[in-house]
UniProtKB/Swiss-Prot annotation:
Record-given protein name: Protein Vpx
Gene Ontology annotations of biological process type: symbiont-mediated suppression of host innate immune response; viral life cycle
Family of this protein: Belongs to the lentivirus VPX protein family.
Pfam families registered for this protein in UniProt: VPR
Gene name of the record: vpx
Function: Plays a role in nuclear translocation of the viral pre-integration complex (PIC), thus is required for the virus to infect non-dividing cells. Targets specific host proteins for degradation by the 26S proteasome. Acts by associating with the cellular CUL4A-DDB1 E3 ligase complex through direct interaction with host VPRPB/DCAF-1. This change in the E3 ligase substrate specificity results in the degradation of host SAMHD1. In turn, SAMHD1 depletion allows viral replication in host myeloid cells by preventing SAMHD1-mediated hydrolysis of intracellular dNTPs necessary for reverse transcription.
Native source species: Human immunodeficiency virus type 2 subtype A (isolate KR)
Cell membrane is among the record's keywords: no
Keyword vocabulary terms for this entry: AIDS, Host nucleus, Host-virus interaction, Inhibition of host innate immune response by virus, Viral immunoevasion, Virion
Gene3D superfamilies: 1.20.5.4730
Chain intervals for the UniProt region annotation (Binds to human NUP153): 61-80
Domain of life assignment: Viruses
Subunit structure: Interacts with the P6 region of unprocessed GAG. Interacts with host VPRBP/DCAF1, leading to change substrate specificity of the CUL4A-DDB1 E3 ligase complex. Interacts with host NUP153.
Location of the protein in the cell: Virion; Host nucleus
Chain positions of motif Nuclear localization signal: 65-72
Length: 111
């Protein structure tokens, strides 16, 4: 009988190719962005992407896929914190406009 420590568990035999991993990363980035726009300000999402690209890709010279992976991790953490802090929109999202309720009412006397 073969040593069980030297056998590869089912599903982990290297069947996933690099191309499939990159495709998975693309799908996850798109999915997190679709969900994040319902919970976080678009400006924040855009700034996280820009700063991730500048820091990991431009400054450190990391690959595009690594930069996307780091962005994905940051956005997952941001969404986790948002929900942990008491997001009440777990079912349907905050709606268009993200987390902002809209402009404040005008001051009294100016209506």
């Amino acid at each position: 009988m073969a040593d069980p420590r030297k056998t590869v568990p089912p599903g982990n035999g290297g069947e996933v190719t690099i191309g499939e991993a990159f495709a998975w990363l693309e799908r996850m980035v798109e999915a997190i962005n679709r969900e994040a726009v319902n919970h976080l300000p678009r400006e924040l999402i855009f700034q996280v992407w820009q700063r991730s690209w500048r820091y990991w890709h431009d400054d450190l010279g990391m690959s595009q896929s690594y930069t996307k992976y780091r962005y994905l991790r940051l956005m997952q953490y941001a969404m986790f914190i948002h929900v942990k802090k008491g997001c009440t929109c777990l079912g349907g999202g905050h709606g268009p406009g993200g987390w902002r309720p809209g402009p404040p009412p005008p001051p009294p006397g100016l209506v």
